[in-house]
């Protein structure tokens, strides 16, 4: 299970401004996903078709915590699989810090997203801090096709894992 510090980090970088939180009702409501498709709720949970109706009624903090834990387990399993099949590395042999770095990438990008960062993944597996620092930054393409840095997430990632 990831550390509390990592879970707090993930909550902050996924939705630190608490988009979709209704203070009066003490419920979370869906909001549009930047990548399109089904809406997202709380901490980056992409709603499945079967979840939409219930989510539109609002979810409690406990319910979104459960979704976060499920999504973290899914990201962890995905990171383990990609590390084994594409990098010939054993996830369980890595330090907790290294595991959490890879889980963060899998949570944010999907487990296959790790394949897009082979130098970073290799550096994590070899505890090569210099290469990690050179390769950790993530970007997105805006609606006009321009590549933009995920600045806040990158800064928080550096602060937690690499500083």
Where are these regions (language model features)?
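Long, amphipathic alpha-helical surface segments
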Residues: 1, 5-8, 16, 45, ...
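Extracellular/periplasmic catalytic domains that process cell-envelope and extracellular macromolecules
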Residues: 1-2, 32-35, 94-97
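Short, functionally critical alpha-helical segments immediately adjacent to catalytic or ligand/cofactor-binding
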Residues: 5-18, 101-105
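A contiguous strand-loop segment
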Residues: 12, 16-19, 23, 69-70, ...
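Surface-exposed patches in mature extracellular/periplasmic domains of secreted proteins
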Residues: 19-25, 81-95, 119, 135
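Substrate-binding/active-site groove segments that recognize
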Residues: 28-56, 68, 72, 76
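Amphipathic alpha-helical segments that form the core helices of the histone-fold
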Residues: 35, 41, 99-106, 122-125
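Alpha-helical segment that forms one wall of the substrate-binding/catalytic cleft
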Residues: 54-87, 96-101, 108-114
């Amino acid at each position: 299970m990831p550390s509390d510090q990592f879970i707090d980090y993930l909550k902050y970088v996924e939705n630190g401004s608490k988009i979709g939180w209704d203070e009066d009702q003490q419920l979370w409501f869906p909001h549009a996903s930047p990548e399109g498709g089904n809406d997202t709720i709380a901490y980056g949970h992409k709603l499945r078709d079967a979840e939409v109706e219930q989510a539109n009624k609002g979810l409690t903090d406990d319910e979104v915590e459960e979704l976060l834990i499920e999504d973290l387990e899914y990201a962890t399993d995905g990171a383990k699989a990609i590390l084994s099949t594409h990098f010939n590395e054993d996830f369980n042999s890595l330090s907790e810090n290294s595991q959490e770095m890879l889980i963060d990438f899998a949570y944010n990008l999907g487990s296959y997203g790790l394949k897009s960062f082979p130098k970073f993944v290799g550096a994590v597996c070899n505890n090569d801090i210099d290469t990690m620092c050179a390769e950790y930054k993530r970007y997105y393409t805006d609606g006009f096709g321009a590549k933009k840095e995920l600045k806040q997430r990158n800064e928080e990632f550096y602060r937690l894992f690499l500083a």
